[in-house]
């Protein structure tokens, strides 16, 4: 492999100043997300989710499925390592990395389960194969082989055939959504000479709504 120490990327000199901030964290996130989509970033909704469980810290890539005034929503098997970690300690961190725009958004907050009705509505919107897959995988557990997973998939497809209905596969009782309520949202803009812009919105009194400007103060942090 190449020596990673020798790889350099010129981030350009696009500035991100305090006067460039949108009125709320939600509006700013939506603006940058739209820029990432327009720049052709692959899966701009991909985010790293970091947790701290009884067995230590861990991180993985998960897809954002909703963002609104409440916070950021993702779905997962609730017996997975990440879900067990959240049950142990609800404090989490999210990181969106958009290489095509030389930007990052880092979020610190707390995770909680979304209402069951919200989980079931989202599950029904998923493609048939994804709904079956949620039943097939006992996420984070070992399996004797890939063939064992495919055999279970075939059994479940026979049990719940694809009828074209969103109700043909029930929502697993161990599968659900998590809402991350933000305490801090950092907007990072890459610039030349490592003098990047880092504007951080901080909610001093606990998790706050992303669509309300009142609870948030702005800090500029050194890169």
From Swiss-Prot:
GO BP field: pyridoxine biosynthetic process
Residues that, per the record, bind substrate: 8-11, 65, 122, 126, 130, 194-196
Main EC class the enzyme belongs to: oxidoreductase
InterPro entries: Pyridox_Oxase, Pyridox_Oxase_CS, Pyridox_Oxase_N, Pyridoxamine_oxidase_dimer_C, Split_barrel_FMN-bd
Source domain of life: Bacteria
Cofactor note: Binds 1 FMN per subunit.
GO MF: FMN binding; pyridoxamine phosphate oxidase activity
UniProtKB keywords: Flavoprotein, FMN, Oxidoreductase, Pyridoxine biosynthesis
Subunit structure: Homodimer.
Role of this protein: Catalyzes the oxidation of either pyridoxine 5'-phosphate (PNP) or pyridoxamine 5'-phosphate (PMP) into pyridoxal 5'-phosphate (PLP).
Identification of the protein by name: Pyridoxine/pyridoxamine 5'-phosphate oxidase
Organism of origin: Kineococcus radiotolerans (strain ATCC BAA-149 / DSM 14245 / SRS30216)
